[in-house]
Design a protein with these regions (language model features):
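Conserved short alpha-helical segments that host acidic/polar catalytic motifs at enzyme active sites
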Residues: 1-292
Length: 292
């Protein structure tokens, strides 16, 4: 059992409040996932730089800064607890291999919009650690994890990002992730954990080479074996999919200003004007998407 949450803002008037809205949603899902938590915030860099989200793990920030100066031309390093957002004009094709070669750190996401933060611990502590309330943006996705099939580590936490400005959170389990992992590795995909959700994220990234997000998730109904509710994010918005059995809960609240999704309605009870929202459960096997 895990908790998933997401907000897509239709109106810009709530952009500065996005972090605060999401933080309450995450904390309310602590009972569904007390082992770790994480979130992805989409907020395009004003200078159109690429943003690389990095977990330092046990590496000292000063040592990381000293080492990275030798290898990468960057504009800014923004430290937030044990995470760093590296901003650079350099494209991912050049920067990603360099960061992946530094074995002491974990590259958890990259793109011109996305920033990812995740860590082991209770969601309430993770929210405070990264000061989620201060974040602004256009949309955001979050996850609280109760570990089942893989270790309780930062690399085992959601969201997973395996492509530029892409991320995925997942409540459920996949039974064919080992076979799918082997196939994706043959196509060049890389994985940092044994988590089934990372495989699903890799599958989506691989499929997006030839399809849009809605088509990719629809194809996943035949390729991904298991029980799941997905929230998949891109630079322009997000999409939601439940498997065709739909045993994993999800509820959506939509107003003229935002769309919110969570595993339980209680996570959305604090949102503005939620009492007048259109509230519904996503149908099994149907892709719902919102974006610009």
């Amino acid at each position: 059992m895990c908790g998933i949450v997401g907000i897509y803002l239709k109106s810009k008037k709530f952009e500065k409040s996005l972090g605060g809205m999401l933080s309450k949603m995450l904390v309310s899902m602590e009972s569904r996932g007390p082992d770790s938590a994480g979130f992805a915030i989409y907020n395009r860099d004003k200078n159109k730089l690429f943003k690389y989200s990095i977990c330092l793990n046990e590496m000292n920030f000063d040592r990381f800064k000293k080492e990275i100066k030798k290898k990468i031309k960057f504009s800014k390093l923004e430290k937030n607890s044990d995470h760093v957002i590296l901003k650079s004009i350099e494209k991912p094709s050049k920067i990603v291999p360099i960061l992946e070669d530094i074995t002491e750190i974990s590259l958890v996401g990259y793109g011109k919009s996305i920033e990812i933060f995740k860590q082991v611990g209770k969601p309430s502590n993770v929210v405070k650690k990264f000061d989620l309330n201060k974040f602004s943006g256009s949309h955001a996705i979050g996850h609280t994890r109760m570990a089942t099939e893989s270790a309780i580590t930062t690399d085992g936490s959601h969201p997973y990002s395996t492509g530029e400005d892409e991320c995925l959170v997942h409540n459920g389990s996949l039974s064919n992730h080992n076979n799918l992992r082997r196939k994706l590795k043959k196509n060049g995909s890389k994985f940092n954990s044994d988590n089934d959700t990372e495989v699903a994220a890799g599958y989506i990234s691989d499929s997006l080479k030839d399809r849009n997000l809605k088509q990719t998730l629809k194809k996943g109904l035949s390729d991904l074996d298991g029980f799941y509710t997905f929230i998949a994010g891109t630079h322009s918005g997000f999409a939601v999919l439940r498997d065709e059995i739909a045993c994993k809960p999800a509820v959506i609240a939509e107003t003229k200003d935002y769309v919110a999704i969570s595993s339980e309605f209680q996570a959305m009870a604090h949102l503005p004007n939620v009492n007048s929202a259109k509230i519904f459960e996503p149908e099994p096997g149907v892709v719902y998407s919102w974006g610009k």
